[in-house]
Amino acid sequence: LRTAVDCLTLTATPIPRTLQFSLIGARDLSIMNTPPPNRQPIQTEVQVYNEDFIREAIYFETERGGQVFFIYNRIAGLAEMAAIIQGLCPDLSIGFAHGQMDGHLLEERIFDFIDRKYDVLVSTNIVESGVDIPNVNTIIVNNAHQFGLSDLHQLRGRVGRSNKKAFCYLLAPPMSTLPNDSKKRLQTLEQHSELGSGFQIAMRDLDIRGAGNMLGGEQSGFMAEIGFEMYQKILDEAIRELKRTEFKELFKEEIAKQDDFVQDCTIDTDLEILIPDDY
């Protein structure tokens, strides 16, 4: 950290627009790749909803002394989903929690889960941030195709917070029935399950969603006429100029390095370099 930094943003997976600001140089970017000691990668699998599989995954975790998150992101059917899980695992204690519960009741439910009064907590994605329960090492996300990539990565981060092997199961309809974007999101989570993969996931999210509607009809100005590549070049030049004028004290080290390299190269020659007639 430097005293010259006025605002520091910390994120596991930057949203595409924020990431784009860093990639074009409008914001500095630092990546922390070193995980806490003794952490293991979270085994991530995409599965079709199957009650036998759910029962097996829950009992595998509870029999080794752990607990389970079951994510169901519809408040209206949350109690019914908890009843289904209770029917699958009648000898286990099942609780449920969501954001519209009374604050005291919600807090009590979470603390009861931390105190191991429940084996399984059926919850909305309210638990995706700020929850650190090392004994929970299996998370099952129902209808995972309806979640965004960053949401799924945050939910997966609720497990594997100790030295135990953790599991994340993403339940979704068969891949062949899903839209392309949903399919890409699930495949990305399954492929990038190693520690410190948040940046790769964010880059894939940028690739899937784009950095914003740059050339759409809502945009004003002349960008649609000059094209995206020229726009990026003009934007890059404007950022470099600002760094050398208004913010030169902040970026003096970067400017010194840039001065050692040629940014653009112009060749002036008498030779004719044209596309041949027979092309």
Question: Which stretches of residues belong to each language-model region?
Answer:
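Post-DEXD/H (motif II) to motif III coupling segment of the RecA-like Helicase ATP-binding lobe
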Residues: 1-67
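C-terminal helicase module of SF1/SF2 nucleic-acid helicases/translocases
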Residues: 9, 51-69, 73, 77-80, ...
